């Protein structure tokens, strides 16, 4: 039972903020179920018009509707509340209270404070939703079964309230009784249906029940297509914007686009005089078809009809009757949802179940030609009316029967209505991206964003007030400690007022400073074209909504970092924007392997070395998503700040393969070299079955599969499926299915354990996932440790060596180790040095150096130089300074007494930015001062504004003449600006502070290390 609540508007709300307004939103609660509306900014008469739906378990519950005022820094303020008893709604006429203004009550019962009013519509849905089944036995309601909450082909953002329907009924014109009879024909004599024991089924008639035969017989009084359209128009007028039902749990059997409008496709499929319907009956050979008229029910809120037919007799079975009910759950002119339920009591165990099929017709994507297209999605499930031991076999028969029948259905429909070619959809990418242009923000708009606030306004008014006071005031006599030119406060009140004025002016000056820094648009990876052939990922960043504000000004300086297959792209920084507009396009260089996920992270910019504040993050999973659905999508952000503000990003994502040739064959050839064994290309039928088994997109292809055992409490025999992006396991024992998969990128480690008695003498492959990854596959995990890592154990492979080599090759292809990344960076650095002939240091003379650090260390120069020696002291010092994955090349002689090397590491301070540091160092001997000169050029990768500058360091070490075994160190610092930016001072200051901290830490460690060595030598 569903309670529908529509929150329309409120009026005369009290002002809760100092600006004389409120930021109201509504929170609804029924039992443990909670929902809330959006926040309406600065409004005392807000309008929402949002619908909500709650499951009702107890009529004694109360619906609590609270109005609150959003506060960004403290707890939200309570405005008022309404309590409505569920039993009051249930006992009302038509189970509806109508649309009524309710007074908001204060928290304290005795208070007479006027809290305003709220307009609500509260009612019960007159019939259960398609997912709230009322039958008994094995059936499960949608509110309790996670299997029924699959992703809908309709936009999930509209999932506010369920659609209304009659009792769930109706399945398509196609049946699957033949599949059942083939399964049960061997047991037809001993196994009789629960409710059909009096019926005898001739085994000679069990052949073509899965080929329904329809001969259309319409009576004169049945509804015409005109009355059918009138009924739908009446239903459309009463549509309340409810959410179309989600796909049913049995799976999707048709998901196709057609070049026709949704309303026309609906007429083609369900009009009483439809020529398609007649052609389908002729093709499938069904006779004695009786199509009832469409009738309005529930005061026109739903439309329903009944169809009956007779299956033709065959050599195996006699004729079988079927009754089908079709009910419109939704019809609003754009989206149509029809639930069909079919009963076939004459098939074996036919009295124990009904089959339900859901047809969803919705608008398709926009085509370049401008023509309308529609998306047809057909899903199914079994509704068991009573328990039966043959449930697993019935489900298998239904699945195969529906698959065969709807292949005929889709092929016939494609002959009547032109399907959309995938090439036409691909062209839509160019059209979708061509309209995106990143427009620079004007200085006037930026000034309004910075200065249109209470701080500036109050400071301006106070300044005018003080100025007028100075004009009219008489100068006071000099007293106390005052003298000419110095006028001190003469009272505590004057002192407080002076302090307030100083603080206000300071804040205004800070705003002016930030405004001057933010005037110029900052660079990004927007417009950088991808290189190479392969899988090309294109991401269009449109806008962000309700990003969290971390600055005292109530705004943020957001930018986005996209990461896929180890490659990153960074957007520009939008200053003082909580709802920024980007309109930027990012292309990732072509990848040999199709990407599995796209990680999206939103940061607030405050200097390249400051601790990054994450405003939210999201993950776009290409394996679980249909790429066509990502062409225009709103991605909700995760994280404490993002979820509190309900932050979202508007993205357009396209994934194409730009290389020629056979993608599958090329990839398999690469894997064959790693495995050392030929890998056969799987047939299209096998690949299609693999994709449907795990719900994968069409570009996913099967590489190999192995029979093995999954080790849990008890070994489970099944098959391990390996593709370019996933590891999947499937087993079906006595009708109990075990199915899961996880990504190669989720695997942290793969181990091979020696054979044991429990593994039946076979080696065990242990796959350990990264913390909190692959949680959807935890059903197959052997253990789940305290760090949140899942471990999967597989053993008893028929050919263990081939399976192990294939697994390791695929894992290595998707997961590069840090050493491999270091090696790649070193090779790239060497090639760059050779091509530029050590030209990195040619510009050092143009850099302005300033001394930033100097001290005298009680260590000899020879020991100090171990800091650059590449040995244990070098490594420990870098780790102590927060440098991860540190690697360095050996010193090589460039010319007389000049040596050079390259280093690579990840700095903890910028690791949140996915930043890496590469540097080139040169050292030369200074004989006249008995010391060394070390020069270093550092380049920051993946850091905001990192491509705007290079860092230059110069270390001068010389032996102290006054004290033996003492080194005098001076460090000089300079920045080589490659591009102009108004943030030079801000970036320079940020880097300088962090550099000084790092030098103190490094030199302090060096002194302690030398002291410990001296003590060890004295002991020995």
Swiss-Prot record:
Keyword Calcium applies: yes
Location within or outside the cell: Membrane
Domain annotation C2: ranges: 1-102, 517-635
Binding-site positions, Ca(2+) 3: 551, 557, 604-606
Transmembrane segments: 454-474
Gene Ontology CC entries for this record: membrane
Domain VASt: 249-421, 848-1010
Location of the GRAM domain: 689-752
Keywords: Calcium, Membrane, Metal-binding, Repeat, Transmembrane, Transmembrane helix
Ranges of biased composition (kind: Polar residues): 134-144, 158-172
Stretches for region Disordered: 134-172
Primary location group: membrane
Domain of life: Eukaryota
Cofactor dependence: Ca(2+)
Swiss-Prot/TrEMBL induction comment: Up-regulated by Cold. Down-regulated by salt.
GO terms of molecular function: metal ion binding
Record CDD domains: C2, PH-GRAM_C2-GRAM
PROSITE patterns membership: C2 (PS50004), VAST (PS51778)
Protein residues bound to Ca(2+) 1: 17, 23, 69, 71
Membrane-related topology note: Single-pass membrane protein
Protein residues bound to Ca(2+) 2: 17, 69, 71, 77
Name listed for the protein in its UniProt record: C2 and GRAM domain-containing protein At1g03370
